[in-house]
Amino acid sequence: MTDAATNMRLKLPITCFILEIILIILFGTLVQYDYETDAKEWHNTSHQDYENDFYFRYPSFQDVHVMIFVGFGFLMTFLQRYGFGSVGFNFLIAAFSLQWATLMQGFFHGMHGGKIHIGVESMINADFCTGSVLISFGAVLGKTSPIQLLTMAIFEVTLFAVNEFILLSLLGTKDAGGSMTIHTFGAYFGLMVTRILYRPNLDKSKHRNSSVYHSDLFAMIGTVYLWMFWPSFNSAITAHGDDQHRTALNTYYSLAACTLATYGMSAITSHDGKLDMVHIQNAALAGGVAVGTAGEMMLTPFGSMIVGFMAGIISVLGFKFLSPILEDKLKIQDTCGIHNLHGMPGVLGAIVGAVTAALATTDVYGQGMADVFPAVADGSVNATKQGGIQALSLAITLGIAVLGGLIVGFVLKLPVFGTPPDTLCFEDSVYWEVPGSESPEEGELTSVKPEETEHLNS
């Protein structure tokens, strides 16, 4: 039997049931199919079935969905005793967040006649929002209870929708791949939460805050899925035609260049020239993050490769040198290193987007300017001002993420959430039935000490 403080027998079912009942009521009251999903509305107009947006967007949605549930979930399985928590809580948070995001994003973007209209594009956007929450999850991985994670998701999804509305609807910011709205927001929100939840005695669990051979292999499954599908992620909601094609291509080459930079930097920063699997699992993905904002712009293939190359270098240096400083000096215990994979590359992507937007001309974009920068095309703003809007959007995103993360962190610090003790962080058996657990004498795959077993069974 687990410790009374971490026992989820009543807390988790009550929380899950109440949240889902509320969601069902809200969906029943506010949500309905959009015209491309509704049987009556679709057949009231003259068109062919293959013109339905489903056939254009669903392949991208499938890829994004795999990234959310398989990619993010398995990327975090590197911890030797927290594989269930990584994949399992990722599953739980994502299932809740996509429903709550549908409501929050619909409230700001999709209200028609007092109803939220949903279709395949709203599914993609909900997954994007969920991705931001899962990024924040990476910062607090192994140190929080499922109740805390669900509570964090409630607040973060809401703030994500507010930030997204300000940037995309009010300011006219371009951020199709979410360098700002998804990665920067999720990273700095999560970093502030984990700062407030700082554990001065986390060293008591440091023997579990590491990987073993097979756990790193599982994490590489997540890396490979994310790497393969990132072009779909960045291009999923861009305009059909050349915009979507260009975004996928730019992401494709950015990731490739980033990967070579990652391998090179990993060897350089190691005193014996050996590769660090932490770098390969994470930094090789930074190119997808960094090209998210500018991916749909005329960045050019070599430009996207430069961005990816820079992102790989920055990310590896962050893992090697910056993460220890953040923990020692700023007391930011970032379990997955989200600052290095999502935070700094996200900021880089926002800067690249601002510069690329400021340099946009009709000679380069022609009539395509209307798709990429509609406000510039219709004369509402010039390219320089669009670049300024992009830069302002980064500042707004950072402000909302930092302030929101600090506030939510204090909420999560309340003693009602059943957090694991310092001695049992990064340990599945606190919240999960773990079959076939090995004793320390039987092998090195387990790091549970005898006194910790007594604590769990008390």
UniProtKB/Swiss-Prot annotation:
Cellular localization per UniProt: Apicolateral cell membrane; Cytoplasmic vesicle membrane
Cysteines engaged in disulfide bonds, as pairs: none
InterPro entries with a match to the protein in the record: Ammonium/urea_transptr, NH4_transpt_AmtB-like_dom, RhesusRHD
The protein's name in its UniProt record: Ammonium transporter Rh type B
Membrane topology type: Multi-pass membrane protein
Biased composition, class Basic and acidic residues, residue ranges: 449-458
Keyword set includes Transmembrane: yes
Extracellular side: 33-58, 105-121, 173-176, 238-247, 296-298, 362-391
Tissue expression as described in the entry: Specifically expressed in the gill by pavement cells (at protein level).
Gene3D superfamilies named in the record: Ammonium transporter AmtB like domains
Organism annotation: Takifugu rubripes (Japanese pufferfish)
Any one cellular-component term (Gene Ontology): cytoplasmic vesicle membrane
Keywords associated with the record: Ammonia transport, Cell membrane, Cytoplasmic vesicle, Glycoprotein, Membrane, Transmembrane, Transmembrane helix, Transport
Membrane topology, Cytoplasmic segments: 1-11, 80-83, 143-151, 198-216, 271-274, 320-340, 413-458
Family named by the database record: Belongs to the ammonium transporter (TC 2.A.49) family. Rh subfamily.
Gene from which this protein is expressed: rhbg
Stated role: Functions as an ammonia transporter. May play a role in the elimination of ammonia in the gill.
Residue positions with a glycan: 44
GO molecular function: ammonium channel activity
Residues spanning the membrane: 12-32, 59-79, 84-104, 122-142, 152-172, 177-197, 217-237, 248-270, 275-295, 299-319, 341-361, 392-412
Source species, domain of life: Eukaryota
Biological processes annotated in GO: ammonium homeostasis
Region (Disordered): 436-458
